[in-house]
């Protein structure tokens, strides 16, 4: 009651925003006479003037009125379109980083030119986001004359472009493209191997068209780049046949090709084993004669040998795994239960499959992924346009910190929205729809019938065919053809069936598309021919208006009121007449699940008979309440997915920041030295624990690992025999000194610049491999974490804790692997260093797949929390996003 009183006194928030912006509209209009007086050259020169003023300290807000007036005048001169006052308000809403709700036909494409031009003045780029490639190309071509007149460049991105073409497109001041393409390019950039491979600039300002579709309907669908996790099965089979020829070393000093470390569950080749496996690989034609397994070009081969050795020496059938239905199934070492669907990483599972002679599965593995929620929140400023956002205003505010401003229509809306008709059965409902369509045909009124699924649209099409009613069907499959059909859906007597999302972005013009008719004329058509086409169109236009405008028929209520409103919004554009009605039945999904009992009891009380409908405001209200419940449920699911994805997103930011930092380095010496010290100290701590007695030490095992894994000869037992008072810290110093000396020899052979490039390649390659494995581990953790709820634990907190532990382990393993490879690989020439980068590029491109996959909805609901847009850069002294409480430089920033 109090809020109602305040609204009456001061107006709603939306009304106050509009009143504030009306003052700016007056300022823009005041500039109009001045702009009209300028020549084309003077008007085009305004852009340079604005850039200079911006560089001299004026803000974009201060330039807004004059810049908007400039765009309006240029639009009139180039396209013959003058922005209405309400379109100026829409442009201001977008510039302020909010969502403009504008009805269908109010010119959203033209509105976007205002904030796009203003923000392009800063030189930092503007991304205009569309729902499909057709709209990206169409809108960029349509609006290009405005931008080019003003001296700005326009780019458009689409999937089939070459790398160079895409780089050029992103350099443009204003770029058009789809949400998928922007997202995939971001992920690909963060898998790039050098800064020159990247295509995107900073994510500065995004204007998202059909923002509800992209930020809400697709919010649960992550973008995924996947690739083949390992090489072909043939290599596994060949290497598997060699391993049984190797002999285990039973005791220290005995002959043998490999040793096993039960404690660490590892198997290591001895010096003799290295020579033996090289001979075997050479005979198998997997290694060139005289070539070392540790040569830079054989890193992947070495990886396969290690996996196969481990599979034979450390993993035993009916203990670590069983073979069932021709598949290797892991046995949980703690519970003894089988774990179907789980697979060991780093090629080990394939090596075990080769050992057991079962089919080797070349699994697709996630290389990189991100949700639209987290991608679009990375932009410095985000805004959006749609015809229907107000019903989702709370979600836009909570998740994206975006306010929805409802923009008034330029002309009053006179569409008649009729009450729903509810039938007992679907058969009755469809019969009523057919009758409505037939009646419209008699009076030549065009009809658009909306369905919730492709299956329903095809079923309705069959019914219309039986009745010999001509019609077109749209299934949102072919966007260009779809736009043509939608453009003609306003012709007299036209009948079009469309799934609710089909044809978004294209207006239905009463009488059909005049532009399409003119475009069909020959290039040398006379003015008389053009005039005849215009007269014919006007006649059709008047005929449709006399018949009542476009008729919208909904065959079922959607789960979201917003989608229903989108369908209704197809009619009544720019003050045109029109009408809409939804036909429902108690057998519809929404009614059956949520509203059937209440509505059915109403129908029984009213004595309804089969074939008779019920039309009552109470019924409509009951249905809308059901939709609200469902919208709330979907919001909770999206919110919960975001809560979980934010954990992965924080880690993604750390990894991508480190990656970018390493790529930008010219010398990686400091990073490698830091890693080496950490790895060597950690190794010593493992075998010679601090604060422990000498009896608990295992110096021989430490010496073996340093020799086998890092090719460092460290006689640790001799040091202890010679000096029993030696301390673990002194052993660390000696081990580190030997590691440095061993590595410095490699540096002296090829020089610091070459070794730096090699180090960078190895770090990036290893980082990518471990990040890929980490994503798989996070996915497995996510799938089972809800079970913690049965133990009275908060699954979300447990997930954060476990994810942090996995992330820390991944970084430790990463450092270990980098130092192991750098220490053991032989580098003789500059070419050896370059071959690693070439291998990495080829491996990354091979079988890379782009996916846009739905996530499971079987997730527990989670508590809500407000999320703000993320900053892109993490400062060295900022808290680490992983949640440890440490500074970034002292935690996960230590790698860079």
UniProtKB/Swiss-Prot annotation:
GO terms for molecular function: ATP binding; metal ion binding; protein-exporting ATPase activity. It catalyses: ATP + H2O + cellular proteinSide 1 = ADP + phosphate + cellular proteinSide 2. The keyword Kinase does not apply. ATP binds at residues 87, 105-109, 507. Residues 866-876 have a biased composition (Basic and acidic residues). NCBIfam families: PRK12904.1, secA. Part of the Sec protein translocase complex. Interacts with the SecYEG preprotein conducting channel. Has a central role in coupling the hydrolysis of ATP to the transfer of proteins into and across the cell membrane, serving both as a receptor for the preprotein-SecB complex and as an ATP-driven molecular motor driving the stepwise translocation of polypeptide chains across the membrane. This is Protein translocase subunit SecA. It comes from Legionella pneumophila (strain Corby). The lineage of its organism: Bacteria, Pseudomonadati, Pseudomonadota, Gammaproteobacteria, Legionellales. The gene is secA.
